[in-house]
Amino acid sequence: MKAFGKSLSVLCLAWLLALAGSVGGASSALAAAPKITLPGKNVDAATTAKLPSKAVPPPKPVLVPPAGNLVIIGGGLRADNAEVWQRIVSLAGGKGARIAVFGMASVNPEKSGQSIINKLNQYGAQAFFVPLGVTLPNSDYRKAAEDPEIVALIHSATGIYFAGGDQARITQALVRQNGHRTAALEAIWDVYRDGGVIAGSSAGAAIMSTTMFYDAKPVLDMLKMGVNDGKEIAPGLGFIGDDVFVDQHLLVRGRFARMIPVMLKKGYQIGLGIDENSAMVVDSRRDVEIIGYSGALLIDLSSAITDRGVKGFNISNAAISYLDRGDKFNLVTRAFTPSPDKADNKLDPNQPDMREPVFTNDILGNNAVLDLMGNLIDNAQQEAIGIAFGNPRDPYPDLGFEFRFSKTVNSVGYSSTEAEAYSVLKLRLDIRPIQLQQPLYRYK
């Protein structure tokens, strides 16, 4: 599989370069290593080539899409979640597949890595530990990341697994101080380009987009005080591409709300947030399939606007969807395919199951947004409201936020014939700041 993927990539690249003409010395896509600026690191100006002031910019290198797959896990993956574990092993080549396990996000990489190895091997893999990590005892992680033996070890794999922990440790170990990829990271990309699978859970999911959460504040504080490069967010490794933002632990921790200010700041139109014990499988055609226990939220800001005249974070006309297990979504065409148990059970807006108003006073609570969306899509009501506010002792205790969800002509729902579950597409979402009375309540 690796040889075939590599040959196909080279042939595609040669054909595209022939059509484009001479590239004037532009780097090959397979060798290109975009610079990543790490928080708190100053890149030497000498590492950046300068063009003459009147030079014609060189053509961009032709990018060949990776032939592999991503398995983006929302954290909390149980050992008995056979659907996810088996999919990772299958995408790596099936029984006996060699999967390189990186425990570098953990304080104890070896312990974390061995736990993952045991689970992968239980499902038929031949997983092995890669001795690379900032916190790995008696090891220089910078030398290890350039070590030819470690690079060869990675190249011997058809799958990669990043365990959970602190995602900053992953990028610190795999990205040079000048912002370029280490030899180990290039080898990981080679596995992916040649048709292998990259899986990651929690912190291992956070690194999948070009921007990741770094030292993030609580969700509500992020809405109140904003996000800053090098603090709340930093560069990720970008396996999913530069047009999709990824987050994890989503429904359990109400993290959908923190995705939106980051997407606005960094210019993302599409964001995907996956819940715990669940995974998004992204293939080379950019089809996303939801597997596991729960689902994912899809946030679309392509038509969203903000009002600069309003003091505080706000957004109007965002679109939010819930993709349940078994659902599929294409990141290129934006086409949605419901799971087989929902395919013939599209909700009729003229025959809603519920009629009562939908409201929650804790929209950031565990699964609160999913419950609200499911109640609204099968309801005679046209909108639902959730609010978020903090502890009276928190910063800005009188500042809260209203989340208004409303149905539009594009809103669609599907109901499962096998379980009490919904897929919900394209609800409108407006968020605006509200002022809370202080104290919030009084004794009688």
PLM-predicted stretches and their roles:
Residues S106, S112-S115, Q122-V151:
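Functional beta-strand-loop-alpha-helix junction segments that form "active/interaction loops"
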